[in-house]
A protein has these predicted regions:
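Hydrophobic alpha-helical connector segments
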Residues: 1-23, 45-47, 66, 72-76
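Hydrophobic core segments within long, regular secondary-structure runs in both alpha-
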Residues: 10, 14, 49, 53, ...
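Phosphate-coordinating loops and pocket residues in cytosolic domains that bind phosphorylated ligands
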Residues: 29
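Hydrophobic/aromatic-rich alpha-helical bundle segments in the mid-to-C-terminal region
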Residues: 35-42, 46, 59-111, 120-141
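Positions that flank functional sites
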Residues: 32
Length: 141
């Protein structure tokens, strides 16, 4: 099933980040590794995005348009990246489930998200304008 394979990518990423926290920290700081100049990194990232896009297209077919599939891909990426960052930075003792190892919390959270992803794609927020991202420009003091 495509969503099972899609979830497997996320589970593998979380396992890798947990097993290699220093490597995760280095590659997640793109300015430190000059990401823009690395053809290998760009190709690798494009390849995994293409696989994720294909799996979502297989999973949803006509149920979700290309934009909805892109939003699902971004949400999944943000979730696994955020979970990996939280694990590597040691946030789970305060945010995790009591008496449960971090690895289990990571897996359970991703599985929870995948369950939501496979559910009705209707909007989850009230109608109205979408929130805007904060500006990165520095404000004068």
């Amino acid at each position: 099933a495509p969503l099972v394979r899609f979830a497997a990518i996320g589970h593998a990423y979380l396992a890798w980040a947990s097993a290699h926290p220093t490597h995760f920290r280095v590659i997640s700081e793109r300015p430190l590794i000059d990401y823009e100049s690395s053809d290998t990194l760009a190709r690798s990232n494009a390849a995994i995005r293409d696989v994720m896009q294909q799996l979502l297209a297989e999973a949803f077919g006509e149920q979700r348009d290309a934009r909805s599939q892109a939003l699902a891909r971004i949400a999944a990426r943000a979730l696994v990246y955020g979970l990996a960052r939280m694990a590597v930075d040691g946030h789970f003792p305060e945010w995790g489930i009591a008496q449960q190892p971090t690895g289990q919390t990571l897996a359970d959270t991703l599985d929870f998200f995948m369950g939501l992803l496979g559910a009705d794609p209707g909007p989850m927020r009230a109608a109205g304008p979408a929130p805007t991202a904060p500006s990165r420009a520095r404000r004068p003091r």
